[in-house]
């Protein structure tokens, strides 16, 4: 498993926004995102990240405690040790107090000529 140094998430909110801080779960620890900009109201784009500097066993974007949050587009940029930075995109989803979106993706495999 690679050591994740930091990540940044960009979310375009669909038709259901939320008022709460955006949180994520990292290895079963619930944390707020840092270095945030934008918003989570309908049509707004939110950006935030976190410098974790740890091996990622699990990582998920967590739904709000009350109501629903519709995510139209989700992009996560990863910076892991000993690998070039990479990004992953996720399909639209709706989160609530019982749902999470798994946003961890292993780094792409190295390619080489044969």
Regions found by a protein language model. Name each.
Residues 1-114:
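Regulatory, non-catalytic segments
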């Amino acid at each position: 498993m690679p050591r994740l140094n930091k990540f940044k998430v960009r979310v375009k909110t669909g038709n259901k926004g939320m008022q709460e801080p955006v949180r994520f779960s990292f290895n079963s620890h619930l944390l707020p995102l840092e270095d945030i900009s934008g918003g989570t109201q309908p049509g707004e784009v939110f950006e935030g990240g976190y410098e974790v500097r740890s091996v990622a066993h699990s990582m998920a974007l967590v739904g709000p405690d009350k109501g629903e949050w519709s995510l139209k587009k989700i992009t996560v940029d990863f910076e892991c040790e000993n690998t070039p930075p990479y990004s992953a995109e996720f399909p639209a989803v709706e989160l609530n107090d019982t749902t999470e979106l798994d946003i961890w993706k292993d780094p792409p495999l190295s390619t080489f000529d044969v």
